[in-house]
Amino acid sequence: MTPSFRLIAVLPAIFVACLSQPLAAADNDLGRAYRAIASKRFVDLTHSFDPRSPVWSGFGQAKMTPAADPKTQRPYTIKEDGFRTTLYEFVGQYGTHVDPPAHFDEKGITMDAIPLKQMILPLIVLDATPYLQTDPNHAFSLTDLRAWEKRHGRIPRGSFVALRTDMYKDWDTDPERFKRAPFPAWSFETIKFLYEQRGVVATGHETLDTDTTDKMESETYILQHGRYQIEVMANLDKVPPKGALIVVTWPKVRNGLGFPARAFAILP
């Protein structure tokens, strides 16, 4: 069992252990795992978003307004009420977000039913950037994947596999370019291979969609086979090809079909 897998096995219970006894006295597996993890570098894989952030044209921009008293319509303020809060209105697939199976499959599980153990996984990062100079809309192929495995080894079963394209750099600086289509993404054959031959748990990418075309065959395959994906990821260029962990979570919306997520990597 690799160090990454040992950490995954105990990470979900660390937070409970921290509540039940002081960390200084915690000298069990969880305490040691916590100290190991706390000493590592963390990388945020999530974009900040607001009403100006890029989104698929079929959804429209978010709205964020001061929440108001429903009786008076007066916005709450710290001066008058001692607090303030915001009313958010946006589609579930906004910013860095989770797509659960039910997003594309009427019989698929919703975001509140995705197992907790699938939110902490070994992270593999495939780098598509070497191919983008000659093909800006490159679909990461099986040939590309085999070249990666020849260099870094076989992708472990149970991993989260993310595709690096560096598209995330346009999120704040050039939102219109970020929304361009087509864009670099997955090939359908690679997605099928990862799930069927490598047994990965989930996949993610930096772009607004899974596919380089509007056929959505890769996304349809993922979600209709009971898997989830994370879209619009950031900072994958700051994560090594293998050896890191990913932690990804989201609000527990009952029967939710998607929602902004928070993802981060713990580096080896």
Model-derived features with residue positions:
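Bacterial N-terminal signal peptides that target proteins for export
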Residues: 1-11
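Bacterial N-terminal signal peptides
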Residues: 9-19
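Active-/binding-site microenvironments in catalytic and ligand-binding cores
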Residues: 23-268
